[in-house]
Amino acid sequence: LLPLTQAKLPFVPLNDFAPVGQVSRLPYFLAVSATQPYKSAKDLLADPKARDGALAYASNGIGSMAHIGTEMLIQRAGAKMIHVPYNGFTPAIADLVTGRTVMVMADLAPLNAQLQDGKLRPLAVASEKRSPFLPDVPTLAEAGYPGTEFEVWLALYAPAKTPRAVVDKLSAELNKVLANPATREAFVRLGHEADYAAPDAVRKRIQAEQSAFAPAVRAAGLAAQTN
Protein backbone atom coordinates (compact mmCIF):
# COMPACT_ATOMS: atom_id res chain seq x y z
CA LEU A 1 0.00 0.00 0.00
CA LEU A 2 2.99 2.34 0.29
CA PRO A 3 2.68 3.61 -3.31
CA LEU A 4 -0.85 4.78 -2.43
CA THR A 5 0.19 6.76 0.62
CA GLN A 6 3.74 7.93 -0.13
CA ALA A 7 4.57 9.91 -3.26
CA LYS A 8 8.36 9.71 -3.10
CA LEU A 9 9.27 6.12 -2.40
CA PRO A 10 12.89 5.22 -3.24
CA PHE A 11 11.61 2.14 -5.06
CA VAL A 12 8.65 0.89 -7.09
CA PRO A 13 7.60 -2.44 -5.52
CA LEU A 14 6.50 -4.32 -8.62
CA ASN A 15 9.34 -2.93 -10.74
CA ASP A 16 12.22 -3.34 -8.29
CA PHE A 17 11.30 -6.68 -6.72
CA ALA A 18 10.30 -10.08 -8.12
CA PRO A 19 7.77 -12.03 -6.04
CA VAL A 20 9.03 -15.48 -5.06
CA GLY A 21 5.88 -16.61 -3.30
CA GLN A 22 3.38 -15.86 -0.60
CA VAL A 23 4.39 -17.16 2.82
CA SER A 24 1.52 -16.60 5.23
CA ARG A 25 -1.68 -14.73 6.01
CA LEU A 26 -2.66 -12.91 9.19
CA PRO A 27 -6.45 -12.66 9.42
CA TYR A 28 -8.12 -9.59 10.89
CA PHE A 29 -11.28 -9.79 12.98
CA LEU A 30 -14.00 -7.23 13.60
CA ALA A 31 -14.52 -7.15 17.37
CA VAL A 32 -16.75 -5.22 19.75
CA SER A 33 -17.04 -5.04 23.51
CA ALA A 34 -19.19 -7.83 24.94
CA THR A 35 -21.27 -5.12 26.61
CA GLN A 36 -22.40 -3.83 23.20
CA PRO A 37 -25.73 -5.10 21.82
CA TYR A 38 -24.34 -6.01 18.38
CA LYS A 39 -24.38 -9.70 17.48
CA SER A 40 -23.29 -9.37 13.85
CA ALA A 41 -21.41 -7.00 11.58
CA LYS A 42 -24.70 -5.99 9.98
CA ASP A 43 -26.22 -5.17 13.40
CA LEU A 44 -23.38 -2.73 13.93
CA LEU A 45 -22.95 -1.21 10.49
CA ALA A 46 -26.70 -0.83 9.89
CA ASP A 47 -27.23 0.91 13.24
CA PRO A 48 -28.42 4.47 12.53
CA LYS A 49 -25.74 5.72 14.94
CA ALA A 50 -23.10 4.13 12.69
CA ARG A 51 -24.48 6.09 9.75
CA ASP A 52 -24.51 9.58 11.24
CA GLY A 53 -21.03 9.73 12.74
CA ALA A 54 -22.14 9.06 16.31
CA LEU A 55 -19.93 5.99 16.76
CA ALA A 56 -16.13 5.72 16.82
CA TYR A 57 -13.82 2.90 15.82
CA ALA A 58 -10.29 2.28 17.04
CA SER A 59 -7.15 1.41 15.10
CA ASN A 60 -3.50 0.85 15.94
CA GLY A 61 -2.46 4.01 14.09
CA ILE A 62 -3.06 6.31 11.16
CA GLY A 63 -2.35 4.61 7.84
CA SER A 64 -2.22 1.13 9.36
CA MET A 65 -3.86 -1.85 7.70
CA ALA A 66 -6.54 -1.73 10.39
CA HIS A 67 -7.22 1.93 9.61
CA ILE A 68 -7.41 1.56 5.83
CA GLY A 69 -9.26 -1.76 5.93
CA THR A 70 -11.88 -0.42 8.32
CA GLU A 71 -12.35 2.67 6.18
CA MET A 72 -12.95 0.43 3.17
CA LEU A 73 -15.58 -1.56 5.08
CA ILE A 74 -17.32 1.54 6.42
CA GLN A 75 -17.33 3.19 3.01
CA ARG A 76 -18.82 0.19 1.23
CA ALA A 77 -21.36 -0.35 4.02
CA GLY A 78 -22.59 3.21 3.61
CA ALA A 79 -21.68 4.02 7.20
CA LYS A 80 -19.92 7.02 8.74
CA MET A 81 -17.80 6.55 11.85
CA ILE A 82 -15.15 8.53 13.68
CA HIS A 83 -11.61 7.16 13.54
CA VAL A 84 -9.69 7.13 16.82
CA PRO A 85 -6.05 6.15 16.20
CA TYR A 86 -3.93 4.72 19.01
CA ASN A 87 -0.25 3.98 19.41
CA GLY A 88 -0.68 0.25 18.92
CA PHE A 89 -3.44 -2.26 19.56
CA THR A 90 -2.95 -2.56 23.34
CA PRO A 91 -4.38 0.86 24.25
CA ALA A 92 -6.91 0.62 21.41
CA ILE A 93 -8.36 -2.59 22.78
CA ALA A 94 -8.28 -1.33 26.37
CA ASP A 95 -10.52 1.58 25.38
CA LEU A 96 -12.71 -0.70 23.28
CA VAL A 97 -13.42 -2.85 26.33
CA THR A 98 -14.38 0.20 28.40
CA GLY A 99 -16.69 1.51 25.68
CA ARG A 100 -14.78 4.58 24.53
CA THR A 101 -14.91 3.17 21.01
CA VAL A 102 -17.36 0.72 19.50
CA MET A 103 -15.25 -1.53 17.26
CA VAL A 104 -11.78 -2.49 16.13
CA MET A 105 -10.32 -4.56 13.32
CA ALA A 106 -7.28 -6.46 14.57
CA ASP A 107 -5.43 -9.73 14.27
CA LEU A 108 -5.98 -12.41 16.88
CA ALA A 109 -2.84 -11.87 18.97
CA PRO A 110 -3.89 -8.58 20.64
CA LEU A 111 -7.54 -9.70 20.85
CA ASN A 112 -7.12 -13.20 22.20
CA ALA A 113 -6.85 -12.55 25.94
CA GLN A 114 -9.97 -10.37 25.97
CA LEU A 115 -11.84 -12.86 23.79
CA GLN A 116 -10.93 -15.67 26.16
CA ASP A 117 -12.12 -13.60 29.14
CA GLY A 118 -15.41 -12.86 27.41
CA LYS A 119 -14.78 -9.11 27.31
CA LEU A 120 -14.82 -8.91 23.52
CA ARG A 121 -17.14 -10.41 20.92
CA PRO A 122 -15.85 -11.27 17.41
CA LEU A 123 -18.43 -10.42 14.76
CA ALA A 124 -16.62 -11.23 11.52
CA VAL A 125 -13.29 -12.08 9.93
CA ALA A 126 -12.08 -9.94 7.03
CA SER A 127 -10.51 -12.82 5.07
CA GLU A 128 -12.03 -14.49 2.02
CA LYS A 129 -12.72 -17.63 4.05
CA ARG A 130 -13.30 -18.38 7.71
CA SER A 131 -10.25 -18.61 9.92
CA PRO A 132 -9.31 -21.95 11.49
CA PHE A 133 -8.49 -19.96 14.63
CA LEU A 134 -12.16 -18.93 15.08
CA PRO A 135 -14.10 -21.16 12.67
CA ASP A 136 -17.53 -20.13 13.98
CA VAL A 137 -16.95 -16.47 13.10
CA PRO A 138 -18.42 -15.60 9.66
CA THR A 139 -16.58 -13.70 6.97
CA LEU A 140 -17.57 -10.15 6.12
CA ALA A 141 -18.91 -11.48 2.82
CA GLU A 142 -21.13 -13.91 4.69
CA ALA A 143 -22.27 -11.02 6.87
CA GLY A 144 -23.44 -9.13 3.80
CA TYR A 145 -20.35 -7.13 2.86
CA PRO A 146 -18.60 -8.82 -0.09
CA GLY A 147 -15.57 -7.12 -1.55
CA THR A 148 -14.36 -5.81 1.81
CA GLU A 149 -11.77 -8.50 2.46
CA PHE A 150 -8.37 -7.52 3.78
CA GLU A 151 -5.59 -9.08 5.82
CA VAL A 152 -1.90 -8.76 6.45
CA TRP A 153 0.08 -11.21 4.38
CA LEU A 154 3.76 -11.96 4.00
CA ALA A 155 5.64 -12.83 0.84
CA LEU A 156 9.22 -13.54 -0.16
CA TYR A 157 10.85 -11.36 -2.84
CA ALA A 158 14.05 -11.32 -4.87
CA PRO A 159 15.72 -8.46 -6.77
CA ALA A 160 13.83 -7.64 -9.97
CA LYS A 161 16.61 -8.84 -12.28
CA THR A 162 16.81 -12.30 -10.71
CA PRO A 163 16.51 -14.88 -13.53
CA ARG A 164 13.05 -16.44 -13.67
CA ALA A 165 14.54 -19.92 -13.39
CA VAL A 166 16.09 -18.94 -10.05
CA VAL A 167 12.83 -17.38 -8.86
CA ASP A 168 10.94 -20.55 -9.80
CA LYS A 169 13.43 -22.75 -7.97
CA LEU A 170 13.23 -20.60 -4.84
CA SER A 171 9.45 -20.63 -5.08
CA ALA A 172 9.33 -24.42 -5.30
CA GLU A 173 11.56 -24.71 -2.23
CA LEU A 174 9.37 -22.23 -0.36
CA ASN A 175 6.32 -24.32 -1.18
CA LYS A 176 8.03 -27.42 0.22
CA VAL A 177 9.00 -25.65 3.44
CA LEU A 178 5.48 -24.30 3.98
CA ALA A 179 4.00 -27.77 3.44
CA ASN A 180 6.01 -29.09 6.39
CA PRO A 181 3.69 -29.64 9.40
CA ALA A 182 6.32 -28.28 11.80
CA THR A 183 6.58 -25.08 9.79
CA ARG A 184 2.82 -24.69 9.66
CA GLU A 185 2.56 -25.19 13.41
CA ALA A 186 5.24 -22.56 13.99
CA PHE A 187 3.18 -20.06 12.01
CA VAL A 188 0.06 -20.96 13.99
CA ARG A 189 1.88 -20.04 17.20
CA LEU A 190 2.45 -16.59 15.67
CA GLY A 191 -1.22 -16.23 14.73
CA HIS A 192 -0.46 -16.71 11.04
CA GLU A 193 -1.77 -19.24 8.54
CA ALA A 194 1.00 -20.65 6.34
CA ASP A 195 -0.37 -20.26 2.82
CA TYR A 196 1.82 -20.56 -0.26
CA ALA A 197 0.97 -18.74 -3.48
CA ALA A 198 3.02 -18.69 -6.68
CA PRO A 199 4.94 -15.62 -7.92
CA ASP A 200 2.37 -14.59 -10.53
CA ALA A 201 -0.44 -14.90 -7.97
CA VAL A 202 1.46 -12.61 -5.59
CA ARG A 203 1.92 -10.01 -8.31
CA LYS A 204 -1.78 -10.14 -9.21
CA ARG A 205 -2.76 -9.84 -5.55
CA ILE A 206 -0.66 -6.71 -5.11
CA GLN A 207 -2.24 -5.11 -8.16
CA ALA A 208 -5.76 -6.08 -7.11
CA GLU A 209 -5.32 -4.80 -3.56
CA GLN A 210 -3.90 -1.48 -4.71
CA SER A 211 -7.02 -0.97 -6.82
CA ALA A 212 -9.35 -2.11 -4.03
CA PHE A 213 -7.78 0.04 -1.33
CA ALA A 214 -7.32 3.23 -3.35
CA PRO A 215 -10.83 4.64 -2.64
CA ALA A 216 -10.47 3.96 1.09
CA VAL A 217 -7.05 5.62 1.15
CA ARG A 218 -8.53 8.71 -0.47
CA ALA A 219 -11.52 8.70 1.90
CA ALA A 220 -9.17 8.53 4.87
CA GLY A 221 -7.17 11.49 3.56
CA LEU A 222 -4.05 9.39 3.18
CA ALA A 223 -3.55 9.57 -0.58
CA ALA A 224 -0.03 10.49 -1.67
CA GLN A 225 0.38 14.11 -2.72
CA THR A 226 2.49 14.62 -5.83
CA ASN A 227 3.03 18.36 -5.42
Protein language model features and the residues they cover:
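Conserved functional loop/turn residues at catalytic and ligand-binding sites
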Residues: 40, 85, 99-100, 107, ...
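Short beta-strand and adjacent tight-turn residues that come in two discontinuous sequence segments
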Residues: 22, 86, 105-106, 125, ...
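Short helices/loops that flank or line small-molecule/ion binding pockets
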Residues: 71-76, 90-104, 109-117, 206-209
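Short secondary-structure boundary segments
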Residues: 34, 107-109, 127-128, 160
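Paired acidic/hydrophobic, glycine-rich loop segments that form the ligand-binding mouth/hinge
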Residues: 56, 102-107, 122-124, 213-215
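Hinge/capping helix and adjacent helix->loop/strand transition within the periplasmic-binding protein
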Residues: 4-91, 140, 153-186
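Ligand-binding "clamshell"
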Residues: 3-18, 78-80, 114-125, 132-144, ...
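An extracytoplasmic/periplasmic, membrane-proximal ligand-sensing/linker region
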Residues: 75-76, 139-142, 164-227
